[in-house]
Amino acid sequence: MDAILSGKSGKMMTQAVEKKGVKIIGWTENGFRELTTSKGPITKPEDLRGLKIRVVGSPIFIETFRALGANPVNMNWSEATTGFQQGVVDGQENPTNGINIPLKIWDYHKFHCDWHYIIDPLMLGVNPRVWKSFSPEDQKLLLECAAETEKYGKALSRLGMDDGSALAYLKSIGKLPETTDCYAVMEANGMTVSRLSNEQIAALAKATEGVRKDWTAKIGADLVKAGE
């Protein structure tokens, strides 16, 4: 993710958004969107067949789960927990540290799958006219704050999943959250955690290859190639 945002593709995305009238002053992230279910562990495409999965209403999410044989359900997040309780849906996908841990997803689902199928980048944007109204000194201060926000947001989303850098950084600024090991917390609350191998992830990617091709054409092959 860092390589993409600091490289050619990140610059291309920033330019594309700024052409639409938004000044980008930074990037952070909400983490990989992982899968939780009530029906059983997910380790291969076949495990998703027939499952009703609550997804964001974006077409790329819906098409991805359909390609895997699941039944994606576009449901507002405000209705999701009720849907879990009533069995309207069998699972959902969301960032672990940002959503699943605070929600205590183990109250609804007992199976977690780390498959890294998509990551949530977050743009820090401002109205260009408002930005130009600030003094150079204030702009500099805001850019410094944005840079700190980038580091803080990334550390929160990666905590317990990286090489320990996130933990060290959050300790250094005195901002450690209550949960520092998401996997241990999920397992302690009765969840089965499946951390997929590269081979297992490749099988899921192969099953959604058609979706990738379609969206490469829509997004732009040059941008996708730059990101690769």
Regions found by a protein language model. Give the residues of each.
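N-terminal secretory/targeting leader peptides
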Residues: 1, 11-228
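Core domains of carbohydrate- and sulfate-ester-processing enzymes
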Residues: 5-9
